């Protein structure tokens, strides 16, 4: 009697390391940050994370922070305005200065199942009484080998590292 042995199918994964620099400013506000994947035609394949002021106010149950999401202009125009926030597993509170890691497995929300091809990881930050910055890292999907491409922002973002694993 023969037995069929099933080999587990492992989906490719990616991790994103986002550095938020501590700025020397008299009025410092934590930045709003959006992280998403774009296809080669600049359409959004999936929004991975959106950090914004989620604190609720007694007179505004959704929190006043949602009205400032549009300050992340590129994300907003490419698909953010269609997102009904909050979204479990995607939206969260703003983060303090430092390094923050996000990990995703293909096909497990919020990481979409991607068709093979060229993509960009895009990270956008906008800060009240501050600036706005967009950093992108091109990559091929699915990864054929473990790679760690990086890009560095100039003011609102520090080093952005994409950790791809087949």
Where are these regions (language model features)?
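Glycine-rich, aromatic-bearing surface loops/beta-hairpins
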Residues: 97-102, 110-166
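Ser/Thr/Pro-rich, acidic low-complexity intrinsically disordered regulatory segments
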Residues: 1-3
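Short amphipathic, basic-aromatic surface patches that mediate peripheral association
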Residues: 16-28, 51-56
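Short coil-to-beta strand junction motifs in C2/discoidin
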Residues: 27-33, 64, 116-119
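Sec/Tat signal peptide C-region and signal peptidase I cleavage site
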Residues: 5-11
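Low-complexity, serine/threonine/proline/glycine-rich extracellular segments that form mucin-like
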Residues: 23-48
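Structured domain cores in non-transmembrane regions
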Residues: 40-114
């Amino acid at each position: 009697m023969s037995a069929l042995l099933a080999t587990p199918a492992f989906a490719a994964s990616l991790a994103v390391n986002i550095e938020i620099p501590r700025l020397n400013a008299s009025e410092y506000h934590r930045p709003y940050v959006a992280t998403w994947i774009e296809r080669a035609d600049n359409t959004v394949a999936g929004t991975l994370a959106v950090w914004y002021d989620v604190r609720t106010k007694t007179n505004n149950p959704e929190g006043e922070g949602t009205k400032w999401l549009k300050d992340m202009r590129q994300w907003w125009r490419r698909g953010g305005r269609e997102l009904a926030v909050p979204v479990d597993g995607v939206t969260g509170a703003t983060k303090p200065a430092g390094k923050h890691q996000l990990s995703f497995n293909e096909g497990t929300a919020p990481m979409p199942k991607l068709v093979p091809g060229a993509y960009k990881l895009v990270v956008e930050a906008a800060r009240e009484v501050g600036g706005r910055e967009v950093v992108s890292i091109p990559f091929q999907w699915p990864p054929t080998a473990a790679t760690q491409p990086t890009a560095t922002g100039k003011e609102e973002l520090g080093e952005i590292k994409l950790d791809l694993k087949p």
